[in-house]
Amino acid sequence: MPVRASIEPLTWENAFFGVNSAIVRITSEAPLLTPDALAPWSRVQAKIAASNTGELDALQQLGFSLVEGEVDLALPVNNVSDSGAVVAQETDIPALRQLASAAFAQSRFRAPWYAPDASGRFYAQWIENAVRGTFDHQCLILRAASGDIRGYVSLRELNATDARIGLLAGRGAGAELMQTALNWAYARGKTTLRVATQMGNTAALKRYIQSGANVESTAYWLYR
């Protein structure tokens, strides 16, 4: 099947990664997607519903490769017990950057599509931005008795009813971090907490489902 899509430059990513990339937005009103239209870009991304096999086949015929599967989940917000988390401060940024860089080294920004250090740098910047309140609105952390950070979660208000987890990581701290996220959303009057993760991250999927989340959608990321 032919694919109709607009092509939009990924301005922030291009500046951050030093690449010339764009994303296709599939819509019936857009022109036909052709190799000539894709040629000016060194990297083109596409995100499609996993159930849409027609688009998947058509994009692969245009030279796109499957990079990653994504699962989006949602859970109802309830008032749960306090986890003891605190708001991260700017003095926590160096440690958080190091932790996020290591935890998220194998995202869709990995080699060979991007530089070997690109994924780590991207998520280090993400968690720093969360501490500063840009993009994600806040970062909360759990501390060990030593004072070291043993877990962190970044969160963002989407609208009057929904909040979304950005990054969540901490070995053995998943349940506490979910408590933290639910408390944060509850305090802001939200009714739904959303989170996305890689299809292959079964540990995260189990944690979210154990915390009450249901799968809302699945998608594939493809690159050319």
From Swiss-Prot:
Q: Which reaction does it catalyse?
A: dTDP-4-amino-4,6-dideoxy-alpha-D-galactose + acetyl-CoA = dTDP-4-acetamido-4,6-dideoxy-alpha-D-galactose + CoA + H(+)
Q: Which Enzyme Commission number(s) are on file for it?
A: 2.3.1.210
Q: Does the keyword Acyltransferase apply?
A: yes
Spell out the disulfide connections. Answer: none
Pfam family for this entry, one:
Acetyltransf_1
The record's annotation in SUPFAM superfamilies points to:
Acyl-CoA N-acyltransferases (Nat)
Classification via HAMAP family: WecD_RffC
Family classification:
Belongs to the WecD family.
Role played: Catalyzes the acetylation of dTDP-fucosamine (dTDP-4-amino-4,6-dideoxy-D-galactose) to dTDP-Fuc4NAc, which is utilized in the biosynthesis of the enterobacterial common antigen (ECA).
Please identify the protein, giving its name as recorded.
dTDP-fucosamine acetyltransferase
